[in-house]
Amino acid sequence: MLRGVLIPVITPFEEDGSVDEGTLRQLVDFYLQASVQGLFALGSSGQGPAMSAVERKHAAEIIIDQTASRTPVIVHVGTADTPTTIELAVHAAEKGAVAIGVIPPYYYCDAPDSAIIAHFREVADAVQLPVYIYENPKYCGISISPQLGVRMKEEIPLIRGMKVAYGAGAMQDYVKLFPDDVSVFTGNADIFGLVPFGVAGMINPPTSFVPELCVELWQSLDRGDYGVAADLQRKVNTVTQIVIANIKRHGRGTVAETFRMRGISVKRFPRWDTAPLPPEASAEMHRAFRDAGILE
């Protein structure tokens, strides 16, 4: 079972919108040097839903190849339809992913539970890989409640994990109701009060440019050093607040700027056109990180 910090890898793009292979490989090495416990590819931060199936396969191949089995890779393969999801899942399995992430089939968000379960069952049957439910109702319009999650696990034994992107209040219900062979990860940054009660770790986008800090936090919690963990959690919370505030004000180009601050020249992110972060906003953000002791 996976535990720890699984990084939601961003997919960097060239100016023409194609996948920037060189920078993506650089990002993988950056995360491996930080000793993260795994990579979560092509979810929301990975821009999977904004890419074609061909592009998603290409990005998955790059990530898995560059990782070279040095850390587990979960590839998110979810789409609005079952055949394409299966196509991406089969590809991920063939290339060496250890598991797949699957968001419920979005757009038709009035689908009954039976249709959602059928979708997940068909995907699982096609690949025989561990399946991680991607619970992200903000973007997909469908929520997998703890009760539905348990029913899905009963009918689909290959379900082995879940990323709960926006359900902090229900985290302990997921942990309590799922059997022990299901790892529950939070998409939030505040894990101090969750890991001691069974949450397996974090898959948090805003902090993905400071993986060392996240790994330190996880390790301190895992060994029960709660004094150190409390200090690290405050830093992680500060990072999250600064990044989210800038995303709300200036858009997702903020994310590219955070990586540039770490020496990784992300040319284009997100996939779509977005105004660059104003120089004064970038300087202010960097100053805030420096004042908090997060970056030099």
Question: Which ranges hold each PLM region?
Answer:
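Alpha-helix N-capping/helix-start residues
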Residues: 15, 21, 53, 146, ...
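A general structural signal for well-ordered alpha-helical segments in protein cores
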Residues: 24, 56, 60, 85, ...
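C-terminal alpha-helical cap/extension of soluble enzyme domains
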Residues: 6-11, 34-36, 198, 206, ...
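Catalytic cores of TIM-barrel enzymes
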Residues: 1, 174-176, 259
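Catalytic alpha/beta core domains of metabolic enzymes, predominantly
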Residues: 122-126, 137-240, 244-247
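Active-site beta->alpha loop and helix N-cap motifs at the rims of alpha/beta catalytic domains
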Residues: 1-7, 11-141, 151, 275, ...
